[in-house]
C-alpha cells in the first residue's frame, strides 16, 4: 500500500526523536569545531596553553576510546570531568595546587603564632623611640650647641674682637700708670720699666690685630 503524505505511519516517524538528537551536548557546539581546542570548553572560558607533548598524550588517550565513549564525554559533563581529572597533567596540577594551599595555610598559622612576638617587638621599638632615642637626641642637640659655641668662639671675627679688648685693657693700664706717676705714687725707675712693658705688649697686640684683620679682608 502506498503511503501518502499525512499518513499515520509517516506522522509517527516524524514525531519520534532520533537517539543522536536526544544527546544534547552540555557545551557550545561551536567550540568543538575550533582547531585550537583540545577539549570541550565552557562558554567564556579562556583556552589553556598545552604543550605539544601533553597534547599528543591526550590525543593518544582519546584514540583508544570508542565512539560511544567519545560521545558520552561530549554530552555528559560529569563523565568529562571524571576523564579530565584522570589525566596525569591535571593530577599533577591539582597536587601542586594542593601543596601550595597547604603551604599557604602553614605560613598563615606561623604568622598568627608569631603575632605576640611581633606586638612585643613593636612595643619595644616604641619604647626605644620615646625614651632612649629622645635621650640620644637631647645629647646630640647639646653637642651641636657646644660645637656651635666653639666655632663661634674661634671664628676670625671673635678672635679680632677679643684681641681688640686686650689692646684696650693694656691701654687703660698704661693710662692708670701715667696717672700714678703724675700723682707721685710711683718713682721714675719703676714707672719707666712698667710703662715700657705695657706699651710693648700693646704694640705687639696691635700688630697682630692689624695682620689678622688684613688677612681676613684679603
Swiss-Prot record:
Which portions of the chain have biased composition (kind: Low complexity)? 28-40
Supply the InterPro entries for this chain.
ESCRT_assembly_dom, Helix_hairpin_bin_sf, Mod_r
Region Disordered, as annotated, extends over: 1-51
Compartments where located: Endosome
State the Pfam families in the record: Mod_r
Q: Which GO terms describe its biological process?
A: catabolic process; protein transport
Q: Return the Polar residues bias intervals.
A: 8-17
The record's function comment reads: Component of the ESCRT-I complex (endosomal sorting complex required for transport I), a regulator of vesicular trafficking process. Required for the sorting of endocytic ubiquitinated cargos into multivesicular bodies (MVBs).
Under PANTHER family, the record lists: VACUOLAR PROTEIN SORTING-ASSOCIATED PROTEIN 37, VACUOLAR PROTEIN-SORTING-ASSOCIATED PROTEIN 37 HOMOLOG 2
Q: Which family does it belong to?
A: Belongs to the VPS37 family.
The name of this protein is Vacuolar protein-sorting-associated protein 37 homolog 2
Q: Which organism is it from?
A: Arabidopsis thaliana
Q: Which gene encodes it?
A: VPS37-2
